[in-house]
């Protein structure tokens, strides 16, 4: 049997920018993408801790080490700069393939917190 399971998440990231007139997506610091095993154009769910909004969008690679978490297009209406969000990626696994998700916790400046 195949199941849709959490593959990874970036936990409590801070929205640093938003651009309503962009074509859509979320821009994520490439360093965080690598740590969370999230690829450019991958589908992610974004959960806004401040207002409870949940939405899906795709990922654009941001400058590595910049700390950028930017909401683009329609998603820019769903959060404010400074809001904290959880960015979740999923994968389809069979029971033999599954491994626990990668969790990347970050500071208010979107710097990874070492385990």
UniProtKB/Swiss-Prot annotation:
Pathway where it operates: Cofactor biosynthesis; (R)-pantothenate biosynthesis; beta-alanine from L-aspartate: step 1/1
Keyword annotations: Autocatalytic cleavage, Cytoplasm, Decarboxylase, Lyase, Pantothenate biosynthesis, Pyruvate, Schiff base, Zymogen
Modification sites for Pyruvic acid (Ser): 25
Gene Ontology biological-process annotations: alanine biosynthetic process; pantothenate biosynthetic process
Binding-site positions, substrate: 57, 73-75
One GO location term (cellular component): cytosol
EC numbers, comma separated: 4.1.1.11
Source species of the chain: Kosmotoga olearia (strain ATCC BAA-1733 / DSM 21960 / TBF 19.5.1)
Subcellular location: Cytoplasm
Record: active site: 25 (schiff-base intermediate with substrate), 58 (proton donor)
EC top class named in words: lyase
Database matches in PANTHER family: ASPARTATE 1-DECARBOXYLASE (PTHR21012:SF0)
Protein name, as recorded: Aspartate 1-decarboxylase
């Amino acid at each position: 049997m195949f199941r849709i399971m959490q593959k990874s998440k970036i936990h409590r990231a801070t929205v640093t920018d938003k651009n309503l007139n962009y074509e859509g997506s979320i821009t994520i610091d490439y360093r965080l993408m690598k740590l969370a095993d999230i690829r450019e154009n991958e589908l992610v769910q974004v959960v806004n801790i401040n207002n409870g909004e949940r939405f899906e969008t795709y990922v654009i690679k941001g400058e590595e080490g910049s700390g950028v978490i930017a909401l683009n297009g329609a998603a820019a209406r769903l959060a404010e700069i400074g809001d904290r969000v959880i960015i979740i990626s999923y994968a389809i696994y069979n029971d033999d393939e599954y491994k626990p998700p990668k969790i990347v916790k970050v500071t208010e400046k979107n710097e990874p917190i070492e385990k």
